[in-house]
């Protein structure tokens, strides 16, 4: 099961590296989704719920989590209980924000799987190392765990080195340096593709890595185009 947070503008599912839930659902990686929708007023929830049901809800079972920060009252809970039926969800999960700290659940985040913060995809010097680190984590936790003889460790070393190299470039103070950074990132991805072709990785693992790399390259191209538009 996978849970995501959707703030009032609902854009966080695609704005951050670790929150492209719509893509993961569309690829069949999620069987049942518990998106948690935060809003200051209960009336805002139904609009967000409709958007999720119309998009992500087509690819997996949907159990909506609805929260009004610490404004929970019996009346609000009763209103929230019917939203999933209205939006076509398969169930409901009511929660209240303060409980994560009151009962010590925040410690799970500090020391657990999600200890690495999300990174904005246009953040020079942070996004690419985060993307490549995620690739390395996928290789470690999936490919090498399930099929240790698939050869993925050979490309993993190159991906990790590329992440360190891009992290060493640091941030960018202006659009000219941002453009240079993203162009270097594009070259890095081309080099990794060539290295993957020569690494002798098992075919199905190679195909999946190429798909993940293509997704990263799409974001690089989008950022290059955005910077070039600003520089005109």
Outline where the language-model segments fall:
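Substrate-binding cleft of secreted/luminal carbohydrate-active enzymes
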Residues: 29-44, 52, 60-223
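Short, solvent-exposed mixed-charge patches
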Residues: 231-232
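Alpha-helical scaffolding within the catalytic cores
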Residues: 8-23, 43-55, 76-80
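Aromatic-lined carbohydrate-recognition surfaces of secreted/lumenal glycan-active proteins
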Residues: 1-17, 60-70
